Amino acid sequence: MAKSIVLYGGQFNPIHIAHMVVASEVNAFIKPDVFYFIPSFISPLKEHTDYLEGRYRVDMIQSVIDDLGFGRICLNEIERRGQSYTYDTVMYILDKHPDAKLYLVIGTDQYNQLHKWFKINELKSYITFVIVNRDKTTQEVESEMLSITIPRIDISSTLIRKRVKNKENIQALVSPSVEQYIREEGLYES
């Protein structure tokens, strides 16, 4: 039987409670054999202010994996460097697991930008998109895509970076291990 693999990519700068909720809900819904967190090197459709080295983001993701009790990190995009195109990452995963059933987790913001994605039509033939809706903002999706709804959690990595810089509390926004890591490493302070 083919393996089922979930791919959950992002900058994770830093990884926070909303990311953890998405991962938990998708993992419970799909019940994959493997759940990969994939930190991007440079996301083609995002701004790159407050960029943080991959090693710090990887350490924080690993602490969240330890907290969640599931998941692995795929370092392909960080090791490849340059623009992080999902198509290239999917080809890498399929090279390692040619018979796998792949699920790619994206939010409604990314769903609405799919027309801008690199090799999107080819990509659709290799994966099943899992569109994560937040609370009442349910996105109608194409028939070959899956859709799940999670509670709305208004947390962003930008907000966390800003609060750290302003020496404000982030305790309810990230896991205790991520907060401790941010403080110990002095991340986002300047």
Curated annotation (Swiss-Prot):
Q: What is its EC number?
A: 2.7.7.18
* Enzyme category, top tier: transferase
| Domain of life of the organism encoding this protein | Bacteria
> Pathway it belongs to?
Cofactor biosynthesis; NAD(+) biosynthesis; deamido-NAD(+) from nicotinate D-ribonucleotide: step 1/1
Question: Which GO BP terms, alphabetically?
Answer: NAD biosynthetic process
| Pfam families to which the protein is assigned, alphabetical | CTP_transf_like
Q: Which InterPro entries match?
A: Cyt_trans-like, NadD/NMNAT, Rossmann-like_a/b/a_fold
Name the keywords, alphabetized: ATP-binding, NAD, Nucleotide-binding, Nucleotidyltransferase, Pyridine nucleotide biosynthesis, Transferase
This enzyme catalyses: nicotinate beta-D-ribonucleotide + ATP + H(+) = deamido-NAD(+) + diphosphate
Write out the GO MF terms.
Answer: ATP binding; nicotinate-nucleotide adenylyltransferase activity
Listed HAMAP family: NaMN_adenylyltr
The UniProt family comment states: Belongs to the NadD family.
Q: Which PANTHER family match?
A: NICOTINATE-NUCLEOTIDE ADENYLYLTRANSFERASE-RELATED (PTHR39321), PHOSPHOPANTETHEINE ADENYLYLTRANSFERASE (PTHR39321:SF3)
Q: What does this protein do?
A: Catalyzes the reversible adenylation of nicotinate mononucleotide (NaMN) to nicotinic acid adenine dinucleotide (NaAD).
Protein name, per record = Probable nicotinate-nucleotide adenylyltransferase
* Gene expressing this chain: nadD
